[in-house]
Amino acid sequence: MLNYELELWEKGLLVAGVDEAGRGPLAGPVVAAAVILPPFTEPFIKGDSKKLTKKEREEAYEEIKNKALAVGTAVVDSAVIDRVNILRATKLAMKRALKDLKYHYDIVITDYVKLEGENCMPLVKGDEKSLNCACASIIAKVIRDKIMEIYHKIYPDFNFASNKGYPSKTHLEKVEKGEYTEIHRKSFSPLKKKLF
């Protein structure tokens, strides 16, 4: 998980890892996080956010915040996603997360998203190959999950605490009936089919 960082750290470069959570759901924001770990940090997490349980993610979240030189986050809501499309919204969130770092970095490693205007290394499965990127994936996922738990209290019928806005069977059934909320992405199928 450190091959790319070690090579960059040996050159004296500070690495920022960036990843997002929430590109695929039908509802809710896309959240990005950027993390800069001290050079030569040994791996201290079991993997990226997808490989951890909720409890493990929350524990890792606290550990990352304690170990990192800097952590930046950004949230882009569903209205912006509908206006600019999910890829542009993801890049916008990532760039805002980098700006939120308020810390110098030399290169950015992403999970296969090229960020224009940045010295960027987009890696296929970057969240599995880069420790900084894996840490960013955990931060983004924990924050997005907390946001969706708040939305669950506002829209309990959609069970956002469980499905996090992803198209579960019951969530899809509600959408197929024409039911949706303010946080649903109207530009995403099947909502787009129902609305236009």
From Swiss-Prot:
The keyword Hydrolase applies. Residues 13-196 form the RNase H type-2 domain. NCBIfam families: PRK00015.1-3. Endonuclease that specifically degrades the RNA of RNA-DNA hybrids. PROSITE patterns: RNASE_H_2. It is found in: Cytoplasm. This is Ribonuclease HII. Keywords: Cytoplasm, Endonuclease, Hydrolase, Manganese, Metal-binding, Nuclease. It catalyses: Endonucleolytic cleavage to 5'-phosphomonoester. A divalent metal cation binds at D19, E20, D111. Belongs to the RNase HII family. GO terms for molecular function: manganese ion binding; RNA binding; RNA-DNA hybrid ribonuclease activity. HAMAP family: RNase_HII_B.
